[in-house]
């Protein structure tokens, strides 16, 4: 029956969406846990934790789960210890990707990331195999609707950041700074403009490859999506952009 089939499809889609949401929550809690263990368990005095909590709230992670994760990390409650690892790989068409991982099993993570690259016409490389194509910087991003660009720019000059630019396609203001200055710059922008949409160390491509061919876009999108669907992968950075499309942070 058509009605039954449609209902089954709806249930399937809802199940897939729920699974994605659950996975996203797990990754957010993992980042909160690591951030709280690395510094003070108070977001006001731990910028990485503050950013993690802000991201969790944007995703509607329940407040009690955020607080429990912080308390468990602060109290050293028995649990899994996570290791931060960065993998470098080559994607199709000369693209380069850096995969950021938080894992409790290094061997499993490496095996799964390698398998995904090989399935999607790419290859996992050695440390340093693609990172030379990027600049390692501090990255701070604000929504254009939330702050005044001239004020942001002036503050950036005072702090001697590398760049403050407008991304009109995505409606964002993007600040980059030296890695050694990141903590100071992040705190200064937070004090004046509030919590940014994103604040983290980032690998920014020296030369951006713009891709407009739909088949190439589909193949690269499939690679990035499968990597980010992996439980251990927090996010992926690359040296490419899709022409005319807005990329998520």
Curated annotation (Swiss-Prot):
Its main location: cytoplasm. GO terms for cellular component: cytoplasm. It holds the Pfam family Transcrip_reg. Gene3D superfamilies: 1.10.10.200, 3.30.70.980. InterPro entries: Integrase-like_N, TACO1_YebC-like_2nd/3rd_dom, TACO1_YebC_N, Transcrip_reg_TACO1-like, Transcrip_reg_TACO1-like_dom3, YebC-like. The keyword DNA-binding applies. Signal peptide: none annotated. GO terms for molecular function: DNA binding. It is found in: Cytoplasm. Keywords: Cytoplasm, DNA-binding, Transcription, Transcription regulation. GO terms for biological process: regulation of DNA-templated transcription. Belongs to the TACO1 family. This is Probable transcriptional regulatory protein Wbm0670.
């Amino acid at each position: 029956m058509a009605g039954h089939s449609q209902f089954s499809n709806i249930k399937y889609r809802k199940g897939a969406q729920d699974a994605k949401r659950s996975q996203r929550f797990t990754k957010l809690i993992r980042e909160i846990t690591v951030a709280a263990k690395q510094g003070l368990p108070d977001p006001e005095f731990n910028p990485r934790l503050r950013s993690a909590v802000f991201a969790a709230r944007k995703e509607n992670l329940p407040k009690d789960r955020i607080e429990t994760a912080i308390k468990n990390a602060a109290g050293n409650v028995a649990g899994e210890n996570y290791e931060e690892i960065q993998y470098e790989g080559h994607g199709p068409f000369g693209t380069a990707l850096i995969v950021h991982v938080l894992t409790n099993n290094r061997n499993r993570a490496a095996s799964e990331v390698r398998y995904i690259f090989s399935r999607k016409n790419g290859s996992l490389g050695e440390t340093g195999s693609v990172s030379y194509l990027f600049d390692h910087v501090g990255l701070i991003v604000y929504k254009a609707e939330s702050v005044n660009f001239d004020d942001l720019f002036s503050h950036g000059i005072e702090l001697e950041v590398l760049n403050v630019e407008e991304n009109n396609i995505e409606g964002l203001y993007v600040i980059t700074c030296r890695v050694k200055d990141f903590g100071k710059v992040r705190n200064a922008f937070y004090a004046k403009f509030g919590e940014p949409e994103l604040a983290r160390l980032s690998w920014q491509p020296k030369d951006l490859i713009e891709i407009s061919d739909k088949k190439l876009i589909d193949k690269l999108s499939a690679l990035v999506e499968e990597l980010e669907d992996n439980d251990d992968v927090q996010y992926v950075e690359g040296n490419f952009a899709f022409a005319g499309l807005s990329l998520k942070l």
